[in-house]
From Swiss-Prot:
One of its GO terms (molecular function) is metal ion binding. The keyword Metal-binding applies. Mg(2+) binds at residues 88, 92. Its cofactor is Mg(2+). Belongs to the Nudix hydrolase family. PROSITE patterns: NUDIX, NUDIX_BOX. This is Uncharacterized Nudix hydrolase SCO1686. Residues 35-175 form the Nudix hydrolase domain.
Length: 181
């Protein structure tokens, strides 16, 4: 994103309940008015299968300061989910040359309080070093999934990430951790 434009000024496609574009709005307006838009969630794992977990900075526009087990963000106006997944993964992980994230599934997130977005979930393997954006990430680490599970009751996680994680676990079914990708 252009350094002169704040994240609140980013233009997003506004979509209906079937994920069809019905208009556009500034990101800040979309959140303030509860307009449905698009987001990507990227499940990033290292070669050992550990999950990238991070704590969001207190300056984030939405859900400041909790932890998240996904990297990702909003899909810009006219941008595809696939392109947004790669862009967000590279930006938030601070890693270039990542393989294109693999699309897993899509769901409609709605917290019932005006936060609603179509959410495309992806997975990517991160072979090299990461250097997350200090503006986005206050802490990070690659955790074994069993440790992540243990932290769910101890750390505050973003609600949309928890929803995506529950759906990811259901999507994987009984095959267990590490079965995706």
């Amino acid at each position: 994103m252009d350094g002169l434009m704040s994240s609140a000024d980013e233009i997003l496609d506004i979509v209906d309940e079937n994920d069809r574009v019905v208009g556009q709005a500034r990101r800040g307006d979309a959140y303030a008015r509860g307009l449905r838009h698009r987001c990507v969630f990227v499940w990033a794992r290292d070669p050992e299968g550990r999950v990238f977990v991070h704590r969001r900075t207190a300056t984030k526009l939405v859900f400041p300061a909790p932890y998240d087990m996904f990297v990702g963000g909003v899909v810009g106006a006219g941008e595809s989910y696939d392109d947004a997944a790669l862009r967000e993964a590279e930006e938030e992980l601070g890693a270039s040359g990542l393989p294109r994230p693999e699309f897993l599934f899509k769901f409609l997130y709605d917290d019932g309080a005006g936060r609603t977005w179509w959410s495309a979930v992806y997975e990517v393997r991160v072979a090299g070093a990461v250097s997350p954006q200090v503006e986005e990430v206050a802490w990070h680490g690659f955790l074994p999934e069993a440790e992540l599970e243990g932290r769910l009751g101890e750390w505050e996680f973003v609600p949309d990430g928890l929803s995506a994680y529950a759906r990811l676990r259901a999507w994987r079914g009984a095959s267990g951790p590490g079965s995706v990708g």
